Each structure stands twice: as C-alpha cells, then as structure tokens.
C-alpha cells in the first residue's frame, strides 16, 4: 500500500500552489492527482491578470500578500513568468460617475490598496506605467480627470472619456509559467503528480485515513486536500461535505488587432459604463423584430475589457454580459456571437474598433469555469472532517490569489499561525448566523 503525507485532488494553479507551500513547510510525501495534465482545464483559460484593487478588505489583504509572493518568485526566477505592472484602467464617459468613482477609490485606498492621486489637466504629476517588469512602479491608483489629460496618455481612447482610474498594483503575467515554476520547485521537495481520478476518501473515526484512485490504488494518507476547481462541490461530497459553491462559464476571445486599435503598451482597459451596442439602423430594426435577437438591442452592463497579448498583434476581449450557472463540462458550449459582441462593446471606449465592423478578424474563442461562493470569497481551510481541507472557489481571481491561497492552506494543514484574513475564507464562516444574514446585502463583490 502506498503511503503519503498529503493527497491533493486537483492540479490546477491552486492545487499546484498548495503542493508548493506544503512542501516548503516541510511535508515531503505529497501526491498531486488529476485526470488532466497540470495547469489545464480552467487554469489554462485565464486572462492572467492580477490587481490589489478590491472593495473587500479581506480580499485586498489576501491579494496584496499574493502579489508580494509573486514578486518574490519573479525575482528568484529572473521573472520567468513575465510579470508586469501595467495596471487596470477603468474608464467612464459619464460625468455623474466621477464623484462615485472617486468615493469608491478613496474607500479602497483606505483599506490598504495604496494612495489615491487625483490629476487634472492643469497640474498632473501622473507617472505612466512601464510596459515590462514591476520594480520602481507606483502602487495605489491615479484618477485622471478630463478628456485632454486622459488622451494625452492614452490617445487610443474615446474623446468622450471624462475620468480614468488607473489601479497601479496590477497587471498580468504568464499563468502557465508561474504554475510550472511552483510545480517544479515543489517536485524538488518531494511533490509527485499522478494522472488519475480520486474516487473515494476513507474516513474512519472522524479522521481521513486514505484516498482511493481510479487506478484501484489506495493511498494511505492523513491529509486530503480538495483543490478540484470546478469540481470542488463534487469532490467535497467524497467526505460528506456539501460545499456552498456554484460554477459559471466565462468566455474569452482573442483576435489579431492588425489596425493597432489597442496600444501595445496599454494597461488592461475596462469600460465602466452600461451601453447599447452600436448597430446600423437597419441592423437594429432587424434584430429588434426577432424575439431571439432582440436582446442584442437592449442595454448591456459595464465591464467590457481588453488588453494586448504577447509581442504580436493579439488582443484579449472579455465581457460578462450573460453569465449563467452551469455544471462543468470538458467541452462547454461557446457563444459564437461573443467575439463580435465584445468587439462592438469595446468601440464605446476604443472608437477605431468600428473599423472592424463587417470585417472582423477571425477570433479564437474559449471558455473556463468560475467556481464561486455567494459572496465571491474563496474557501480555504478545514472541510469539517479531521484531515480534510479545501482550497478553491477562487472565481475569476485564481491566478492572482493562488500563491496566498496555497500559503494559507499550508498554514491550516501544518498548524502554523494564521494571518488576520484567514477567518474570512474559512468554511466555518457560514456557521455564524450574522455572517449568513450579511449575504443578502453583501454589495460589491469585486468581480470584473
């Protein structure tokens, strides 16, 4: 019979990070089990971005810690995963939103995201972001007011923009390279990967005793970690725990921006206003006449966003305009209209996108699953059975949170001291009636 100190179900970015930090904490015989190759499925569908700009103090603290860890790994590795600090730029053309944007930014700044600096055209000490690397870059955020100032630094944006909030401790990286760095460092400390499926967890006397695999092998182990991503709930049932999570399909499109509409040194660009899509009059009339397409003429939510990708002309386009809960599938259904809808939505922020109308570049479309709790906080810690732990429900922030989630999970397993934010992510938070009552009026979850 095989013996391990810990078995981790799921080799996505969270499982790999958990393995890395458990190994660093001194646990040597760690088995990472997944039906699929490491860092595939949802981890391979990431936008690969990160930000510390969160309205939730616990989330902000978690992500700040995760960014600290990622920056340390970048320095150790010669920045093998190409972490940058270009930031997130939230843009609005609605004068009524400016005070709201400033007030919300003041609040996030006070929570620990860094100083908020407000700039006008008359007096601006705004420091543009560097395209590569992250050292010697400002944190906090810069609020640029007025079209002239905004377009001085971002000439590709619409002249209707009246405010642009540049969150600075933010950017993107290669999620695959970060994951492989964590996996390889873990392997050097005793982490082993096995392709297979966890089919059962043996619990005796209220304690985890072992794990059964689809190969028929039983692994004796006192610790079982559920890091199964979109299958978190299914795997939780193996120890008799019904985890309060659901999954949603989120899409992403990549196109060649041959016209250079998006600046190659741009930050992540986010349009913060609701809008109706720009159709020609005859197109709009035809769409409105058909009950199945009428929704394309109605109001779409804020949040369409894009960024340049790689050294060529690729751009990513994302917009969560129609998200529904869905059980995870290997080949999820993809909305073939999504790329054109996202491109048309981006034209509100990037007017030259209209030059692609009617001759859109061939898109690459894919989708991954967000696994979420109701309030969009992760689950990290004990799972209600001695020796069973969970690390997941990281929604759309898996890459940016992975390092801190792995570190926190390892602290729970080894009994190390826990950071102040740990209770906010423990499954036991739902045992508190006051916490459950807050869920009905939670407010901004920070989801982009």
Where are these regions (language model features)?
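Flavin (FAD/FMN) cofactor-binding core of flavoprotein oxidoreductases
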Residues: 136-152, 324-325, 336-403, 407-413, ...
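Glycine-rich FAD pyrophosphate-binding loop
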Residues: 23-44
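Dinucleotide-binding Rossmann-like beta1-alpha1 core, especially the glycine-rich loop
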Residues: 47-149, 153, 301-304
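Short beta-strand to alpha-helix junction loop
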Residues: 57, 61-64, 91-98, 165-184, ...
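Active-site lid/adjacent beta-loop-alpha segment flanking the redox-cofactor pocket in flavoenzymes
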Residues: 257-386
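Central helical "cap/lid" subdomain
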Residues: 215-287
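Beta1/beta-strand and adjacent pyrophosphate-binding region of the FAD-binding site
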Residues: 1-14, 31
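Helical element adjacent to the flavin cofactor pocket in flavoenzyme catalytic cores
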Residues: 158-160, 164-223, 227, 231
């Amino acid at each position: 019979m095989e013996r391990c100190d810990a078995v981790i179900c799921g080799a996505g970015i969270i499982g790999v990070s958990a393995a890395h930090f458990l190994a660093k904490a001194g646990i040597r015989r760690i088995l990472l089990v997944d039906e699929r190759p490491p860092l595939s499925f949802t981890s391979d569908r990431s936008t690969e971005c990160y930000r510390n700009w969160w309205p939730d103090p616990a989330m902000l603290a978690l992500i700040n810690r995760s960014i600290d860890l990622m920056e340390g790994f970048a320095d150790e590795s010669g920045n093998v995963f190409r972490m940058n600090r270009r930031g997130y730029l939230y843009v609005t053309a609605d004068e009524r939103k400016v005070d709201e944007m400033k007030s919300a930014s003041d609040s996030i700044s006070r929570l620990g995201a860094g100083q908020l600096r407000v700039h006008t055209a008359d007096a601006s000490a705004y420091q543009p972001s560097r395209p590569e690397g992250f050292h010697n870059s400002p944190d906090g955020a810069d609020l640029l007011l007025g079209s002239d100032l905004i377009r001085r630094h971002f000439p590709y944006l619409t002249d209707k923009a009246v405010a642009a909030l540049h969150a600075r401790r933010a950017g993107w990286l290669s999620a695959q390279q970060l994951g492989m760095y964590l996996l390889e460092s873990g392997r050097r400390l005793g982490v082993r990967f096995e392709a297979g499926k966890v089919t059962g967890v043996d619990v005796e006397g209220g304690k985890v005793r072992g794990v059964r695999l689809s190969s028929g092998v039983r692994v004796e182990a006192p610790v079982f970690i559920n890091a199964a991503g979109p299958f978190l709930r299914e795997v939780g049932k193996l120890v008799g725990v019904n985890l309060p999570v659901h999954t949603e399909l989120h899409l992403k499109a990549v196109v060649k921006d041959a016209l250079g509409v998006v600046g190659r040194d741009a930050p992540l660009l986010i349009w913060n206003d609701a809008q109706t899509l720009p159709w020609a009059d005859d197109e709009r009339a035809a769409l409105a006449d058909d009950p199945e397409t009428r929704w394309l003429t109605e109001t779409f939510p804020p949040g369409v966003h894009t960024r340049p990708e790689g050294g060529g002309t690729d751009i990513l386009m994302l917009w969560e305009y129609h998200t529904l809960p869905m059980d995870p599938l290997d080949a999820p259904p993809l909305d073939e209209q999504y790329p054109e809808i996202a491109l048309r939505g981006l034209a509100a922020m990037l007017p030259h996108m209209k030059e692609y109308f009617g001759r859109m570049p061939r898109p690459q479309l894919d989708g991954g699953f967000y696994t979420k709790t109701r309030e969009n906080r992760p689950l990290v810690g004990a799972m209600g059975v001695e020796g069973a732990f969970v690390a997941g429900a990281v929604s759309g922030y898996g890459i940016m949170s992975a390092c801190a989630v792995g570190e926190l999970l390892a602290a729970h397993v080894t009994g190390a001291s826990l950071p102040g934010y740990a209770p906010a992510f423990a499954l036991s938070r739902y045992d508190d009636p006051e916490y459950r009552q807050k869920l009905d009026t939670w407010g901004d979850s920070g989801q982009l």
